[in-house]
């Protein structure tokens, strides 16, 4: 039975999709392997313009000493895919080290959490691989920020992280299989990754048991949000009026963010990447209020909620006249809806009398963003075709 609260949600699609998801078993007893290959080569990512457009992160991966591509070095998710052999003239670099290859690391933090954590499971117990084994990865850029800190929280030091941006041969390469496929299945090895991170955060974070906080994590500080989201400042104000502390998560380390969450009774945020961070919290009693910016089901959030056992209260805050058809691209407009008013009323919270549901400036901004997206959508096939021609 679904433990999440949908009393403040109107989308029939969300309700039906959630029901379908909870009817399936996602924890599997699948045996996953981490095989090693002597004198193996790591190929950095190379754009694959012949492949599908969305979610294709290019070719690349691991090739054994005989030139055979190692299929386990690819990634197949529910949306994103990465990996595949391509011809190369020579090896650019030879490093006399043993490494474990954790795959392609996306520069998008949400995709890092969902897609790029599936091959981290050998890092939980590196001793099994042997002494002085380092961690190799490819990706958009070198690891930084909270993505790197999450790897550090598995016991990996910065000096043992090797970013591969050219064809590189190693003494030995360990290649782990995926421990999960987002939204579809996961193994106990995958679960252990997050349990380990939770425990290490618990050891680092300062927790003041006497503090009982209510917090709202806002997206208004994200540059990307400013390009596609309108109206959240109004939501900030109504939550602040009810004694919620307002935080910008992009200014917090993952340890600091969990320190805040772990001593909170209530956490509120817009649906998207922010609530995915709850997978690192050991506070299972927190009331998580997720504000829907559209009527599209976020399967990966419920997938993470299942893995680490947290419950969600969903509240619609989008204008039904302008609801987006996706979770990421938008544009989105959020406001004080009847569903939010009902949630506040049912929970002894108040909305300031002067709060305006309709703001002319917000709607004008939204319509401009909507027009911009329409133009981009029309130009995208031309842009992709041009890229394909230039890279032939």
Identify the role of each PLM range.
Residues 1-390:
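The feature primarily captures lumenal catalytic ectodomains
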């Amino acid at each position: 039975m679904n433990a999440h609260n949908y009393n403040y949600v109107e989308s029939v699609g969300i309700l039906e999709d959630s029901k379908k998801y909870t009817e399936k078993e996602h924890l599997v007893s699948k045996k996953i392997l981490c095989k090693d290959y002597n004198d193996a080569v790591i190929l950095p990512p190379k754009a694959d313009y012949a492949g599908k457009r969305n979610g294709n992160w290019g070719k690349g991966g691991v090739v054994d000493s005989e030139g055979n591509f190692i299929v386990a070095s690819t990634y197949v998710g529910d949306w994103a895919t990465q990996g595949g052999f391509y011809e190369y003239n020579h090896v650019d670099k030879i490093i006399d080290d043993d490494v474990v290859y954790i795959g392609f690391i996306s520069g998008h933090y949400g995709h890092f959490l969902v897609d790029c954590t599936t091959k981290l499971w050998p890092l939980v117990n590196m001793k099994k691989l042997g002494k002085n084994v380092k961690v190799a990865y490819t990706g958009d850029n070198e690891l930084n920020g909270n993505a790197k800190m999450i790897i550090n929280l598995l016991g990996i030091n910065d000096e043992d992280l090797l970013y591969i941006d050219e064809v590189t041969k190693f003494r030995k390469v360990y290649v782990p299989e995926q421990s999960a496929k987002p939204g579809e299945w996961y193994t106990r090895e995958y679960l252990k990754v997050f349990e380990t991170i939770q425990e290490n955060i618990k050891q680092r974070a300062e927790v003041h048991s006497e503090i009982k906080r209510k917090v709202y994590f806002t997206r208004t500080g994200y540059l990307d949000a400013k390009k596609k989201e309108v109206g959240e400042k109004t939501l900030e104000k109504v939550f602040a009026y009810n004694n919620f502390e307002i935080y910008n998560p992009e200014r917090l380390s993952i340890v600091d963010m969990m320190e805040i969450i772990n001593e909170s009774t209530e956490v509120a945020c817009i649906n998207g990447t922010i609530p995915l961070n709850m997978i690192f919290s050991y506070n299972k009693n927190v009331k998580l209020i997720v504000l829907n910016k559209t009527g599209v089901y976020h399967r990966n959030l419920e997938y993470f909620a299942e893995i680490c056992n947290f419950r969600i209260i969903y509240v619609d805050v989008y204008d039904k006249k302008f609801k987006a058809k996706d979770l990421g691209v938008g544009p989105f407009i959020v406001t004080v809806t009847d569903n939010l008013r009902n949630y506040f009323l049912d929970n002894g919270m108040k909305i300031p009398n002067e709060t305006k549901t309709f703001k002319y400036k917000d709607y004008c901004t939204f319509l401009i963003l909507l027009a911009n997206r329409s133009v981009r959508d029309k130009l995208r096939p031309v842009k992709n075709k041009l890229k394909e021609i230039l890279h032939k």
